[in-house]
UniProtKB/Swiss-Prot annotation:
<dbReference type="InterPro" id="IPR012134">
    <property type="entry name" value="Glu-5-SA_DH"/>
</dbReference>
<dbReference type="InterPro" id="IPR020593">
    <property type="entry name" value="G-glutamylP_reductase_CS"/>
</dbReference>
<keyword id="KW-0963">Cytoplasm</keyword>
<protein>
    <recommendedName>
        <fullName>Gamma-glutamyl phosphate reductase</fullName>
        <ecNumber>1.2.1.41</ecNumber>
    </recommendedName>
</protein>
<dbReference type="GO" id="GO:0004350">
    <property type="term" value="F:glutamate-5-semialdehyde dehydrogenase activity"/>
</dbReference>
<dbReference type="InterPro" id="IPR016163">
    <property type="entry name" value="Ald_DH_C"/>
</dbReference>
<comment type="pathway">
    <text>Amino-acid biosynthesis; L-proline biosynthesis; L-glutamate 5-semialdehyde from L-glutamate: step 2/2.</text>
</comment>
<dbReference type="InterPro" id="IPR015590">
    <property type="entry name" value="Aldehyde_DH_dom"/>
</dbReference>
<dbReference type="GO" id="GO:0005737">
    <property type="term" value="C:cytoplasm"/>
</dbReference>
<dbReference type="InterPro" id="IPR016161">
    <property type="entry name" value="Ald_DH/histidinol_DH"/>
</dbReference>
<dbReference type="GO" id="GO:0050661">
    <property type="term" value="F:NADP binding"/>
</dbReference>
<keyword id="KW-0641">Proline biosynthesis</keyword>
<comment type="similarity">
    <text>Belongs to the gamma-glutamyl phosphate reductase family.</text>
</comment>
<dbReference type="InterPro" id="IPR000965">
    <property type="entry name" value="GPR_dom"/>
</dbReference>
<comment type="function">
    <text>Catalyzes the NADPH-dependent reduction of L-glutamate 5-phosphate into L-glutamate 5-semialdehyde and phosphate. The product spontaneously undergoes cyclization to form 1-pyrroline-5-carboxylate.</text>
</comment>
<dbReference type="InterPro" id="IPR016162">
    <property type="entry name" value="Ald_DH_N"/>
</dbReference>
<keyword id="KW-0028">Amino-acid biosynthesis</keyword>
């Protein structure tokens, strides 16, 4: 069969498997996930060995340090993948939940019940842990899932998917409930995006070019997981030590991920003292700072920021920085340049914190906390499918509930419409 025919078959079989998944009891889904987690631990040496093939190929292709970090699996990261699956197993099952019930004047009882979306297609790059995270969330929420990972992680993804699919068979669940498209060519993505008859939604996770390609070519509704141009605004009332701890964590703990800090905004009233303070802290950790004119006035060694820097997701130890007139200017800057991912304010002023929360137009808005907490696990969702920067059908980190929709249920006692 051609690539197009094979992908159509994968999608059609996933559609059939989705009906079985939708009927699966919560206890059965939970046991499946627990067995999947154990299988990952038991087969960790094989996963790591396959991952080495991807890392070697990535080094030969000249992938950046950030990309290689996203790609790399070791024993601790495989354990983290298994732990994330276990966390999903422990979460309440949203399927079948009645979210409201009301009585009409004619005594009809009307309600809304959560149901699976059906078949979810996920297209992603670099991070092989997405394979297990996506499988766990989609299966727990009663969906079938069709995965298409990046060519740079093909060996890792195939190893993980094969291990997980084996557990489906052991539990008597159609193996097509979890499929990984094995074709690394772009044709595989193109054909997947044509399967509107079988796939209900596409969730792309990756770089700007991938997101744009999916949006422009998909016949299926898309929930975008765009880049993370994350901001922190240091207000005039901020505690300097708290601000330093948060900023250093947000920028340097793991710079190659989408919730790392990319732009720092500083209130003009504290610029004279705070800019040298934070410049010294970050430059000592090898962070390159690119500042506007006022920032460079107080940190002369900083590089000059250009217009492109305000839009940049660096994913490395580079940080854009600007001094702003106040809260209004900070909010305006964020709403202009943000990718709608995650923003944080460091402040001692409650009123300012509430204005920031209300007026900043992003999926996650924080007060006195690192942007690195913008993560499904950290926010109590369990493993996340990603962080949506699309307001429909979900916004921010997507957990189990975000992989369901609702249908109306109506109870009558013989009513007919007059």
């Amino acid at each position: 069969m051609s690539v197009a025919e094979q992908i159509r078959t994968i999608a059609a079989e996933a559609r059939q498997a989705s009906f079985a998944m939708a009927k699966l009891a919560s206890a059965a889904k939970d046991q499946l996930l627990l067995d999947m987690a154990l299988a990952l631990i038991n087969d960790a040496p094989h996963i790591i060995e396959e991952n080495k093939k991807d890392l070697e190929a990535g080094q030969e292709r000249g992938l950046s340090a950030a990309m290689l970090d996203r790609l790399m699996l070791n024993e601790a990261r495989v354990k983290g993948m298994a732990d994330a699956i276990r966390e999903v197993a422990q979460l309440p099952d949203p399927v079948g939940e009645v979210t409201g019930m009301w009585k009409r004047p004619n005594d009809l009882m009307v309600g809304k019940m959560r149901i699976p979306l059906g078949v979810i297609g996920i297209i992603y790059e670099s991070r092989p842990n997405v394979t297990s995270d996506a499988a766990a969330l989609c299966l727990k929420s009663g969906n079938a899932v069709v995965l298409r990972g990046g060519s740079e992680a093909i060996h890792s993804n195939l190893a993980i998917a094969t291990i997980l699919k084996a557990q489906l068979a052991k539990h008597g669940i159609p193996a097509a409930a979890l499929s990984l498209i094995p074709f690394v060519e772009r044709e595989g993505v193109t054909e997947m995006l044509k399967q509107e008859e079988f796939i209900d939604v596409i969730i792309p996770r990756g770089g700007e070019s991938l997101i744009r390609f999916v949006v422009e070519n998909s016949k299926i509704p898309v929930i975008k997981h765009y880049k993370g141009v994350c901001h922190i605004f240091v207000d005039a009332t901020a505690d300097f030590e708290m601000a330093r701890e948060i900023i250093v964590n947000a920028k340097t703990q793991r710079p190659g991920v989408c919730n790392a800090l990319e732009t720092l905004l500083i209130h003009k009233d504290i610029a004279e003292t705070f800019v040298p303070f934070i410049y010294e802290a970050l430059s000592s950790l090898k962070v390159e700072l690119r500042g506007d004119k006022t920032f460079r006035q107080f940190a002369p060694k900083a590089a000059k920021a250009t217009e492109e820097d305000w839009y940049a997701e660096y994913l490395e130890l580079i940080l854009a920085a600007a001094v702003v007139d106040g809260l209004d200017a900070a909010i305006d800057h964020i709403n202009r340049y943000s990718s709608l991912h995650t923003e944080s304010i460091i402040t001692g002023d409650y009123a300012n914190s509430q204005r920031f929360i209300r007026e900043v137009n992003s999926g996650v808005v924080m007060v006195n906390a690192s942007t690195r907490f913008s993560d499904g696990n950290q926010l109590g969702l369990g493993a996340e499918i990603g962080i949506s920067t699309t307001k429909l059908h979900s916004f921010g980190p997507m957990g189990l509930t975000d992989l369901t929709t609702t249908k109306f249920i109506v109870y009558g006692s013989g009513q007919v419409r007059p």
